[in-house]
Amino acid sequence: MPRPSARKRPRSVASPPPPAPAATPEPTPSPAPPETPARKPRNTVRTKAPLSRRFLALAGNIGAGKTTAAKMLSQSFGFELFDEPVIDNRFLRDYYTDMKRWSFTLQLEFLIRRVEHHELIHSVRKSCVQDRTLYEDPEIFAKYLHGLGHLTDSELDLYYEYFQRLSRNIVRPDKVICFEVGSVDILLDRIRTRGREEEKGIGRDFLRGLNGYYTSFPQVLQEKYGVDCLVLDVSQQDIRRGRGREEFLDRVSSFLA
């Protein structure tokens, strides 16, 4: 009979009192974690900015609004800005004065500068926005200048050889936004408004010819280079302020998501 008494003791030890102090649920009413949303203001830039690292490039005719958009995206999303290398280009003014003499030289200059941009973008550990793509030069400007007689067959072939060699291992944009402005008058008005001295000689026919090449450029980007492209008609939309600005930023955010 001593054995049953030994069994009863363990039962009394495992009695419910110990679980009762499981007043550990008391800490659960700690609604402290929900306060973490207060950290959201870290995104002082814009809450809809893409979270992962992105390389976005902007394409479009001269005066289409790429520079304005690139600066705005840099400020709104916190992207590193890579401006079009126009201001520092030593051949640009001569080019618009005598296109036949300076077209090949200018295209090589732009190619070298844009490849340098791509190398820098590869080393930057944040999202980047580039004002004008590397691909517009071989697919639009070089072909157009050759068609106008400003580049010889030999110069065009040599340019493409340089392009193939220099762009072989560069990082490509994740996405490209192509700005479309059908009206040459709007382009000319924007060019005059920004007042770059070296662009004063740009004529209506030159811009109209470029527009023809930009029509097929998005398809070339996707099929030849495997880069996704969003086409935006910005002829009448003012993306600098108000509702136009918000709609533009929302479109870009959705495109990059």
Descriptions of predicted regions:
Residues 66:
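Conserved lysine of the Walker
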Residues 58:
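Hydrophobic anchor at the beta1->P-loop junction of P-loop NTPases
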Residues 1-42:
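Long, basic/Gly/Ser/Thr-rich N-terminal segments
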Residues 71, 75-114, 140:
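Conserved substrate/cofactor phosphate-moiety recognition/catalytic segment
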Residues 61:
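P-loop (Walker A) phosphate-binding loop of NTP-binding proteins
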Residues 2-11, 188-257:
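NTP-dependent small-molecule kinase module
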Residues 139-213:
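A glycine- and Lys/Arg-enriched "phosphate-lid" helix/loop adjacent to the NTP-binding pocket
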Residues 46-53:
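Phosphate-binding P-loop
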